[in-house]
Structures are given as C-alpha cells and as structure tokens.
Amino acid sequence: MNLDYLDFEQPIAELQAKIDELRRVGTSQEINLTEEVNKLEEKNAQLTRQIFSNLTAQQIVQLARHPLRPYTLDYIQRIFTDFNELHGDRHYSQASAIIGGLARLNGEPVMVIGHQKGRTTQEKIYRNFGMARPEGFRKALRLMKLAERFSIPVITLIDTPGAYPGIGAEERNQSEAIARNLFEMAQLKIPIICTIIGEGCSGGALAIGVGDRTLMLQYAYYSVISPEGCASILWKSAEKAGEAAEALGLTANRLHELGLIDEIIKEPLGGAHRDTDAMAEKLKKHLQANLTNLQAKSANDLLEERYRRWLSYGKD
C-alpha cells in the first residue's frame, strides 16, 4: 500500500506506480514512451475524477487529515509576505499549537492567526498535534486586540481536531478561554475572515472562528465533534464513525446548504496536498476578494452584520 494515498485512493496509486515505472524504463533504456505515459495519465485523471465525484463524508474527513495536507505555515509562506511571528499570551506561555503574526496580503497589512500541526514526531509533540491549550487561545486574542488597535484586518486559518482536553488545560480554564474569544471576536471593529483549511473541530475551531466571512476548503470538515468521538458517545464504538460523519453534516457542501459557511474553495484534483501552490493561489484570491469587500464597510456596519449573521444560526 502506498501511504501517500488513502485506502479509497489505492486504485489511483496503483495506476500512478505504472506511470512512474514506464517513465523509469523510458529514461534508463532511452525509449520514447511519451504517448503511452500520456494515455495512462489521462486514464489516471479520469479515475481520480470518478472516485472524487462520489466521496462519503468519512472519506472527506480522511482527506482533511491527510498527513501531506498543507498546514497554516505552508499557506503563510505562499500567500503572505513579510510575516513576523508574534509570541506568547502574556499570562502563561508561548503555546505553539497556534501561530500568529503580522504579514502583508498583496502589500496590505493583515494579522494572520492559525492552528499549526506537525509532520515529524518532534513537530507533532511541539505543536501538540494542533490542539491548543488556553494560552494558545489567549495569545490569539491578544493578537486580534493588537490588530484592532491599529485597524488591521484579521485572517484566521482553522485546522484542529479540537481544543486540548488535558488536566493542565482545564486547570487554566480552557472553557473560559474559548468563551472569551467568542465574546471578544464578536465585537472587534475590524474585518475578520475565517477559513477552515483542514479539520474544524469543536470549540478549538470556534475559538478563532467568529468572523464576517467563513470560507472552507472543499475537502475540509467543520463539526461540533469528531466522527469518532460522536460514534463513541452514541454507539459506544468508534467503528460507527462513517455513520456519525454522515449524521453530523460536516462537509463543505452540507454546511453551505445550511448557510453556516459563505464560500467553498475548490481544491486541486485529488486534494490540496496534490498541488499546494495552486491551492494557495486560489485561497489567496478568495481572501483578497472578501477582504476588499469587507474593508469598504464601516466598523458599525461590520458589527451589525456580524451580530445578525451569528444570531441567525439555528433559527430556521
């Protein structure tokens, strides 16, 4: 099994292996196999389109968790310039599961804040697997308040399996930190654009998810709980995660139908990890378009629309 591909992608992986083998043979034996390679590549693209046209909710969850999927820092490096990371919550610690700092989007200053996971074992431990402790949320709020002081828009990138549930986090009042962010973000007199780039789970996602616009990548998910957590509660078995994923309605298409997100950003064929540069360029265009729209509004209009938007959830 090719570990760069998920279980439902293995037919694609097998065909790609044949393409790679043909290329090796052509190069080593100086044979022109371009026509054969092109035919197989077209066949592989068709197979990929076929598989990805009918994904289940649980398969989308798998894509959102793909180990090669772009993380916040990958997008910061490709979308923004002059990024200057800011550290610490001024209460307890640095909190590396959330990163943030000043940057420029097409020359305009912005405050970028997002969850950051790790790829290697050491990075995963350092970033706490993208699960923020209270100090992470307090750092994020500190940066948002700083942005408000200088009338700088905030852009958040959401990618977390949830807020960290450890004893220390609870002792430092995890629930208060999340609630405080919801309360304060609702009142910030600056544009806020939130984008779910991977996992958007529970209060850990909401703590940097209150904004004027909510964007979502095509194969990200946004939910009150993970499918496995939901299945463990309702069916006492994580094996029912597939059923839970369908019931939760956590996909971009479903959330857009419900009016909980504003835009779905299409991903490259096979997912964002198949062409990170193209995905970043597309996300950049959506961010810029929404930012231009929001910056044309007064602070009072922003707040009024934000209040109406969030108070409308769950009414219909």
Swiss-Prot record:
Q: Which UniProt keywords apply?
A: ATP-binding, Cytoplasm, Fatty acid biosynthesis, Fatty acid metabolism, Lipid biosynthesis, Lipid metabolism, Nucleotide-binding, Transferase
Q: Does the keyword Cell cycle apply?
A: no
Q: Is RNA-binding included in the keywords of this UniProt record?
A: no
**What is this enzyme's EC?**
2.1.3.15
Specify the CoA carboxyltransferase C-terminal domain's residue ranges: 39-293
Alphabetical GO biological process terms: fatty acid biosynthetic process; malonyl-CoA biosynthetic process
Instruction: Report the subcellular localization.
Output: Cytoplasm
Q: Which GO terms describe its molecular function?
A: acetyl-CoA carboxylase activity; ATP binding; carboxyl- or carbamoyltransferase activity
Q: Which Pfam families match?
A: ACCA
State the pathway, as annotated in the record: Lipid metabolism; malonyl-CoA biosynthesis; malonyl-CoA from acetyl-CoA: step 1/1
Top class in the EC scheme = transferase
Q: Name one GO cellular component term.
A: acetyl-CoA carboxylase complex
Q: Catalytic activity annotated for this protein?
A: N(6)-carboxybiotinyl-L-lysyl-[protein] + acetyl-CoA = N(6)-biotinyl-L-lysyl-[protein] + malonyl-CoA
* Matching InterPro entries: Acetyl_CoA_COase_a_su, ClpP/crotonase-like_dom_sf, COA_CT_C
The record's listing under PANTHER family reads: ACETYL-COENZYME A CARBOXYLASE CARBOXYL TRANSFERASE SUBUNIT ALPHA, ACETYL-COENZYME A CARBOXYLASE CARBOXYL TRANSFERASE SUBUNIT ALPHA, CHLOROPLASTIC
* Assembly notes: Acetyl-CoA carboxylase is a heterohexamer composed of biotin carboxyl carrier protein (AccB), biotin carboxylase (AccC) and two subunits each of ACCase subunit alpha (AccA) and ACCase subunit beta (AccD).
Q: Which HAMAP family match?
A: AcetylCoA_CT_alpha
Please report which protein family the annotation says this sequence is part of.
Belongs to the AccA family.
Give the protein's function.
Answer: Component of the acetyl coenzyme A carboxylase (ACC) complex. First, biotin carboxylase catalyzes the carboxylation of biotin on its carrier protein (BCCP) and then the CO(2) group is transferred by the carboxyltransferase to acetyl-CoA to form malonyl-CoA.
Q: What is this protein called?
A: Acetyl-coenzyme A carboxylase carboxyl transferase subunit alpha
* Protein species of origin: Coxiella burnetii (strain RSA 493 / Nine Mile phase I)
